């Protein structure tokens, strides 16, 4: 999994780029960067993954992440939580900003249900079947439906369902977000004054996470 965490040092925004190994259950690479543009992310991932076995990288929906991972030629999957969050936002915004008839609302509600069938199924064959059914239903074409069906769900189907191909691939990025919250809760990441302090806190908290993680693994192995 890959993600970035913003923090501000003396009023200047910085980004912690981080790569999380699901199998090891910890961060395996982290870097403080000036930006999170696709070039910076590509360089970070390329260095971090050199000579490493790569299965798939999970991220949220930022385009900078997509561009960087596509350039790496590594399989890429989207976090299901962020996908649902984005879909909910798009539908809510469209409902709020447009005068819709009850019939139009029903049609859009059905569309959302059909999309969720794809996202919530537990096997790839069912996801493909629901995708084909979505196409066959021929929902009314307008800017909104075109964008959500033909520019998101259909072209990114593989990125939405990678976790169904391999059970070792998680469907969400919850683990990396959890470690971020443990290391840098909001009240801390807004108050860092110097880079050295940030790095020191990061390594101390990460070491604590790893020790706790190792204890839990040893405990569950008996």
Where is each model-derived feature located?
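Amphipathic alpha-helical interaction/assembly segments
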Residues: 200-208
């Amino acid at each position: 999994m890959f993600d970035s965490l913003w923090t501000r040092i003396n009023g200047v925004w910085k980004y912690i780029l981080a790569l999380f190994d699901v199998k090891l259950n910890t961060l395996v690479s982290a870097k403080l960067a000036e930006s999170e543009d696709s070039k910076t992310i590509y360089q970070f991932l390329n260095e971090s993954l050199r000579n490493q076995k790569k299965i798939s990288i999970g991220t949220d929906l930022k385009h900078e992440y997509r561009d960087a991972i596509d350039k790496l030629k590594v399989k890429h999957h989207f976090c299901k939580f962020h996908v649902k969050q984005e879909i909910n936002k798009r539908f809510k915004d469209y409902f709020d900003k447009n005068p819709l008839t009850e019939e139009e609302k029903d049609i859009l509600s059905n569309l959302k249900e059909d999309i969720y069938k794809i996202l919530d199924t537990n096997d790839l064959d069912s996801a493909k079947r629901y995708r084909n059914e979505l196409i066959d239903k021929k929902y009314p074409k307008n800017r909104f439906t075109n964008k959500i069906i033909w520019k998101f769900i259909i072209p990114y189907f593989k990125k939405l369902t990678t976790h169904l191909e391999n059970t070792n691939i998680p469907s969400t990025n919850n683990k990396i977000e959890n470690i971020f919250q443990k290391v840098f809760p909001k009240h801390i990441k807004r108050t860092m004054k110097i880079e050295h302090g940030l790095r020191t806190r990061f390594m101390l908290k990460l070491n604590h996470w790893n020790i706790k993680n190792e204890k839990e693994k040893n405990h569950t192995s008996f």
